[in-house]
Design a protein with these regions (language model features):
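Amphipathic alpha-helical segments of tetratricopeptide repeats
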Residues: 19-23, 56-66, 94, 132-136, ...
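Extended alpha-helical scaffolding segments used for macromolecular assembly and cargo binding
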Residues: 1-44, 49-56, 98-140, 147
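Amphipathic helix-loop-helix modules that constitute alpha-helical solenoid scaffolds
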Residues: 42-126, 157-168, 225-229, 240-250, ...
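A conserved hydrophobic secondary-structure block that centers on an alpha-helix together
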Residues: 116-163, 181-190, 197-203
Length: 378
């Protein structure tokens, strides 16, 4: 039943069924069921529940979940150093040749890395470092391929600093993915290649890769709603930056409707914060834009400062600048700047550049408002 719910996109419900089943299962199977529950909670946007279960799963394996992004950063730097010193060479082994507890540990770190990747990027990257080292040590080709592919996605968040490494990882990932010929690995490759292009400002290339990813996942895989959610989200955001607003407005309502039908909090929040304001601005309805974003972020975790909070901030400021409320826009940014820095969101180069230009626009809008008021007073 849990698998059936996950396959229909009901991640939260599926996760709860996994937890119920774990209570009546033997130790090893119970741990695997709890891992799957943690993964589905995180992928479905039930972040607080997911982290709670994840702590239990990781604790049973002797792995501590970093309590904050800052704590995770120190561990991440160590993992990255270990990966560089070790290299990416691996000895291929079949799944049957690898101990079950070793595979479970790899999969648990994969669940954490994937589930936090586009929520709490630094904490996700820390688990990805662990995941990468474990996958390479085991040598199972599919797990190595997805580890290197996901590593390319995380590497792309460093922007121009990590461009060469990202390109190298994507090249290696493509060779592995083509060799093993597993649809999920193929879809994941185009998803990460698309996100890497998006973060590099190559939006047409990003859109093409992300559309390819959506097609592969939709036609060949089950239980991949998170993957499709992100392929669609970043594809639509690419259209936004390309200025293809008509295409964006045509496609967005149906995707939002589908997310609500399966109560996919991850998709509802991402679409609601990162994109829903734009059609409202086009229709000159800033009040509806504010309402849409508030309803979207209201459903999200209130612990920490996640990428979803960043998207909400981005949208709110865009709406206030459009409305001529530069002073309000600047106040919103300034109020959220400290939590954003604390959450290490600005360690992602694309986010830093975007937020700096937005703060400058808000400051200019404030200046314009002040000048207009001075002219009126005069």
């Amino acid at each position: 039943l849990g698998n059936a719910l996950v396959n229909t996109g009901r991640s939260g419900e599926g996760a709860r069924i996994y937890l119920q089943a774990a209570n009546n299962a033997k130790a090893e199977q119970a741990l695997e069921l709890r891992r799957k529950a943690a993964e589905q909670f995180l992928l479905g946007g039930h972040i607080d529940e997911g982290l709670k279960v994840l702590e239990t799963v990781m604790g049973s394996m002797g792995i501590k979940v970093p309590p904050t992004p800052k704590r995770a950063l120190l561990s991440l730097l160590l993992r990255r150093l270990q990966i560089r010193l070790r290299g990416l060479i691996f000895k291929s082994q079949t799944e049957a040749e690898i101990p079950a507890n070793q595979l479970l540990k790899i999969d648990a770190c994969w669940s954490a890395a994937l589930g936090l990747a586009i929520v709490d990027t630094i904490r996700g990257a820390e688990f990805q470092g662990r995941h990468m080292l474990l996958a390479l040590a085991a040598g199972e080709p599919y797990r190595v391929a997805r580890a290197i592919t996901l590593e390319a996605g995380f590497s792309s968040t460093t922007g121009s600093r990590g461009k060469k490494r990202t390109e190298m990882l994507l090249k290696m990932a493509k060779e592995l993915v083509d060799k093993i010929n597993v649809p999920h690995a193929q879809g994941l490759f185009y998803l990460m290649a698309g996100i890497a292009s998006f973060l590099a400002g190559e939006w047409l290339k990003a859109h093409e890769n992300l559309e390819q990813s959506t097609s592969i996942f939709s036609q060949n895989c089950t239980g991949v709603n998170w993957e499709i959610d992100n392929a669609q989200l970043f594809s639509l955001r690419s259209l936004l930056y390309l200025g293809e607003l008509n295409k964006l407005c045509e496609r967005l309502p149906a995707i939002v409707k589908q997310a609500h039908e399966r109560w996919d909090i991850y998709a509802i929040t991402g679409l609601g914060t990162a994109l829903s304001y734009m059609p409202c601005i086009i229709e000159d309805n800033p009040e509806q834009a504010r309402k849409n974003m508030w309803e979207a972020i209201e459903k999200w975790s209130h612990e920490g400062f996640h990428l979803q909070h960043y998207w909400a901030l981005l949208g709110q400021v865009q709406v206030e600048v459009y409305s001529g409320q530069g002073n309000t826009a600047l106040k919103i940014i300034n109020a959220q700047w400290s939590p954003m820095v604390k959450g290490l969101l600005l360690e992602v180069q694309n986010s830093l550049v975007e937020m700096l230009q937005l703060r400058a626009r808000a400051a200019l809008a404030t200046l314009k408002t002040t000048e207009n008021q001075m002219l009126k007073d005069y």
